[in-house]
Amino acid sequence: MTTVVNLPRDPNTLSNYNNWVSTHITANFDILFDQRKLAGNVIHRFRSTTDGESNHIILDTNHLDIGSVKVNGQPSEWEYLPRLEPYGTPLKIKLDQGVKLNETIEVDISVQTTEKCTALQWLTPAQTSNKKHPYMFSQCQAIHARSIFPCQDTPDVKCTLDFNITSPLPVIASGLPVRGSSEAPKSDGKTLYKFHQKVPIPSYLFALASGDISEAPIGPRSVVATSPDKLGECQWELEADTEKFINAIEKIVYPYVWGEYNVLILPPSFPYGGMENPIFTFATPSIISKDRENIDVIAHELAHSWSGNLVTNASWEHFWLNEGWTTYLERRLRHGEPYRHFSAIIGWKALTDSVEHFGPEHDFTKLITNLKGMDPDDAFSSIPYEKGFNFLFHLENLVGKSKFDRFIPHYFNKYKGKSLDSYEFKSTILDFFKDDSDASTALNELDWDSWFYAPGLPPKPDFDTSLVDVVYDLAKKWLSLPKSSFKPQPEDIRGLTANQVVVFLEQILVSERQLTPELSKLMGEIYGLAASQNIEVANLYFQVGLQAGDASVVEPTADLLGKIGRMKFVRPLYRKLAKFDRKRALDTFEKHKGFYHPICRAMVEKDLFGKKDE
């Protein structure tokens, strides 16, 4: 039998989820640090969506070791179908007969992960902050859950979850901890940790972490969890704003449904800023900047509790429905309109960078992408975030903010617990405003096809530049050197926020005029940029220096690349370093590639060497 992609809507799954839907998963895993694998079983409850027409279930798997399969307690025949890159090896489970519409069956699969698992990263004690214990964590978005257990690995299917996880070290999962349920350590020193996720979630939100983890409160319904030696500084960074953010977004949408909102600060090799795993946001330590200036990551991941986690894109081709909405909500949380526009200006720079990286005609620069045969990770960029945000911002301006504010809770109520695509979004907003002649006319006259399918940049909004004008002016002064009489002073940036310094450095980076190596070095010395504790600032300064040809930033750049695995910083730094000193870039990558998460490592390899088949 050949392997086929079973549409309806998601081209990135091989499962036949149009015939069967998983409604509950019980995941029983033993975390084996010495073997770097998970071992156990998963029990799926499947509901039939046909009337006896399907006598087999096909699940996504990738590099898994399957032991046995039982259907309703009885051993079942199963086989692997031919592998299909990049989606893995489908698991076909045979049933004696079809099942009536809406009836359920239970499928129990014994499974172990393998060394080729793309979802898990295993850290040695040396890779953690206090160097005492090993650590593991998962990252399942976009299609990596299938490398932990057989599943319908698509955002178009959601189910409830129970986790029963045994480990010698504390465990975090994307469910509510069943408080007081952990048993006393067994003779082998392991403890059973239980979690329950009562809200149906898609497979990409399945999450596990285990290591030397302690917790501290950061709000009435929130804790931060991290390495004990970092707990105090993480608590300080997050305790002032977390509950404020929750209250603010509840006023915009509706009350938080997940019970607790907690944050796990991961070791530095985590490849993203944050991952919106329910109950426990997984976050990069790069947000701990000791100035509370980088917690917009927390605002973003919290907003995912509504957009993405409750209301979900049906496939990764419509990823903007997750990330555009989340970016829009995040920017509604903080500091009023001038700051919202300021944040959007930073986002516009990220959007132009992504369009430049792919090329203005590339399919990945469209709001709706074509991912047939593609790995969704290859399309990952700021485009769904920022093009999505700008589309929603355009709709807000089109109908008026007060009217759009009435649409927001309607939309999130209509699709609560469901997945949707862009066409359903369009029909929903058109229907909501059908009795408002002004809004309805404006929405019906909108060129939806251009927004959905045109590559490249969208129309640029008329942003309020009040918070960026001062840094635009400072950038112009630097770029006027050495011809002008401008004399840089430390006072130039005193009183600016770190995010304003970020915009200043971005202006230098995008200018057609380049700084000389001497001026770039002078900037770092006068403003103390290379020594900044804020990695958003330091990494951009290193990019400025590399672009200017300042050899003095090569060493600190290589040093930083061995300390952080967040792709937002790692990928552009490697690209800039490779242009300036390719050998040093390759040597640095060779030295640190074992430190990076598999997703990050694969993307940097593509940046440095091109695709493997090229």
Curated annotation (Swiss-Prot):
Q: Which residues form the active site?
A: 301, 385
Give its E.C. classification number: 3.4.11.-, 3.3.2.10
**Is Electron transport there in the keyword field?**
no
- Where found, per UniProt? Cytoplasm; Nucleus
* Catalyzed reactions: an epoxide + H2O = an ethanediol
Q: Which UniProt keywords are present, listed alphabetically? A: Cytoplasm, Hydrolase, Metal-binding, Metalloprotease, Nucleus, Protease, Zinc
GO BP annotations of the record are: cytoplasm to vacuole targeting by the NVT pathway; lipid metabolic process; peptide catabolic process; protein catabolic process; proteolysis
Top-rank taxon, per record: Eukaryota
Q: Which InterPro entries match?
A: Aminopeptidase_N-like_N (IPR045357), Aminopeptidase_N-like_N_sf (IPR042097), ARM-type_fold (IPR016024), LTA4H (IPR012777), LTA4H_cat (IPR049980), M1_LTA-4_hydro/amino_C_sf (IPR038502), M1_LTA4H (IPR034015), Peptidase_M1 (IPR001930)
Q: In the record's cofactor note, how is the cofactor described as bound?
A: Binds 1 zinc ion per subunit.
UniProt: Zn(2+) binding residues? 300, 304, 323
Keyword Hydrolase attributed: yes
Per UniProt, the enzyme's principal EC class comes to: hydrolase
Q: Which SUPFAM superfamilies does the UniProt record give?
A: ARM repeat, Leukotriene A4 hydrolase N-terminal domain, Metalloproteases ('zincins'), catalytic domain
Tell me the protein family, please: Belongs to the peptidase M1 family.
Q: What does this protein do?
A: Aminopeptidase that preferentially cleaves di- and tripeptides. Also has low epoxide hydrolase activity (in vitro). Can hydrolyze the epoxide leukotriene LTA(4) but it forms preferentially 5,6-dihydroxy-7,9,11,14-eicosatetraenoic acid rather than the cytokine leukotriene B(4) as the product compared to the homologous mammalian enzyme (in vitro).
Q: Which PANTHER family match?
A: LEUKOTRIENE A-4 HYDROLASE
Name of protein: Leucine aminopeptidase 2
